[in-house]
Amino acid sequence: MLPAALLRHPGLRRLVLQARTYAQAAASPAPAAGPGQMSFTFASPTQVFFDGANVRQVDVPTLTGAFGILASHVPTLQVLRPGLVMVHAEDGTTTKYFVSSGSVTVNADSSVQLLAEEVVTLDMLDLGAARANLEKAQSELSGAADEAARAEIQIRIEANEALVKALE
């Protein structure tokens, strides 16, 4: 909060009011479709998979653990870890995606936004290649020259372990 002395200056008061108006408008997302329904948006930098679609449930992998999201879920903001996102549609079908990282936001109005760095449908992945990449990264770990190289290899190991788990 700005000190009261700053608000006495007419120019600053106008600036503060403009900022508050913008923040209030940006903080009010579009309402969900109705009671008991969940509006779901899922996108990557290159593709939109769902745009305000009504879905029954979304299962997400986060740094604090995997969890399922239903309508009226407690609001939360979580960081995604590499893993499987499962979207359960209203008609009972389930679609599975592999995400590398990103964030998921659950709002009080039952709207959910999932923004992922990279997204791939499972049918586009090769279990054999994931296993080979995992073995290669694990063998490179002991020969890492420095901490930066070691951290990079560890990330590759975690991502490929998640890929193998999702595909098995």
From Swiss-Prot:
Transit peptide location on this chain: 1-22
CDD domains reported for this sequence: F1-ATPase_delta (cd12152)
SUPFAM superfamilies linked: Epsilon subunit of F1F0-ATP synthase C-terminal domain, Epsilon subunit of F1F0-ATP synthase N-terminal domain
Name of a matching Pfam family: ATPD_C_metazoa
Modified residues (N6-acetyllysine): 136, 165
Localization: Mitochondrion; Mitochondrion inner membrane
Keywords: Acetylation, ATP synthesis, CF(1), Hydrogen ion transport, Ion transport, Membrane, Mitochondrion, Mitochondrion inner membrane, Transit peptide, Transport
Annotated family: Belongs to the ATPase epsilon chain family.
PANTHER family: ATP SYNTHASE DELTA/EPSILON CHAIN, ATP SYNTHASE SUBUNIT DELTA, MITOCHONDRIAL
Summary of subunit composition and partner proteins: Component of the ATP synthase complex composed at least of ATP5F1A/subunit alpha, ATP5F1B/subunit beta, ATP5MC1/subunit c (homooctomer), MT-ATP6/subunit a, MT-ATP8/subunit 8, ATP5ME/subunit e, ATP5MF/subunit f, ATP5MG/subunit g, ATP5MK/subunit k, ATP5MJ/subunit j, ATP5F1C/subunit gamma, ATP5F1D/subunit delta, ATP5F1E/subunit epsilon, ATP5PF/subunit F6, ATP5PB/subunit b, ATP5PD/subunit d, ATP5PO/subunit OSCP.
Protein name: ATP synthase F(1) complex subunit delta, mitochondrial
Organism: Rattus norvegicus (Rat)
